[in-house]
């Protein structure tokens, strides 16, 4: 098993803190369901540091949000944040892709978009099923939450997470071809 580097542990800590604190703010769209801009953190940190970082940032960060908010820890949704973070981080495993170095192509962006969207759908369905089966939540309520959360997360991913990640890669690309003049 690979050891986590100090840099990766620090990134996970910072990402989890940002995701956890920013997760306290959102716009209500359904019962106990919000558009939370914090989801963009999972996209950015996942693309920068990979699936393990995305997974841990989602798990730890969501636990922080639920703990601070005081409504109890909803483990299905905590795990769903981890799943989303993991899916967002899969892009980092593609050969030639690097936000840090500004190296990417259209295929990489498509891959991030597809894995991100699939990850969101799988994660939210998991959270809903967990709430019904384990937490005993009413089916009708969960259907509304799952639909609302899926729409909200897709919007945040497409409007904030994906464009910010592409923007970071583009800004780093500009600096990769600088030459020192003598």
UniProtKB/Swiss-Prot annotation:
The keyword Transmembrane helix applies. It comes from Bacillus cereus (strain ATCC 10987 / NRS 248). NCBIfam families: PRK13661.1. The chain crosses the membrane at residues 9-29, 40-60, 71-91, 114-134, 142-162. Gene3D superfamilies: 1.10.1760.20. It is a multi-pass membrane protein. It comes from the Bacteria. Its main location: membrane. This is UPF0397 protein BCE_2667. Pfam families: ECF-ribofla_trS (PF07155). It is found in: Cell membrane.
């Amino acid at each position: 098993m690979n050891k986590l580097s100090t840099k990766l542990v620090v990134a996970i800590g910072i990402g989890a803190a940002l995701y956890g604190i920013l997760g306290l703010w959102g716009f209500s769209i359904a019962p106990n369901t919000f558009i939370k801009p914090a989801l963009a953190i999972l996209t950015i940190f996942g693309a920068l540091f990979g699936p393990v970082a995305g997974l841990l940032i989602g798990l730890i960060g969501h636990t922080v949000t639920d703990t601070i908010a005081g409504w109890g820890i909803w483990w299905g949704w905590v795990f769903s944040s981890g799943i989303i973070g993991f899916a967002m981080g899969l892009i980092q495993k593609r050969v030639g892709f690097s936000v840090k170095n500004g190296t990417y192509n259209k295929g990489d962006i498509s891959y991030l978009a597809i894995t991100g969207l699939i990850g969101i759908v799988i994660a939210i369905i998991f959270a809903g099923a967990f709430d019904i089966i384990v937490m005993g939540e009413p089916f009708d309520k969960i259907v509304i939450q799952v639909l609302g959360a899926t729409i909200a997360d897709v919007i945040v991913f497409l409007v904030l997470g994906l464009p910010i990640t592409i923007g970071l890669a583009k800004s780093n690309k500009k600096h990769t071809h600088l030459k020192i003049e003598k």
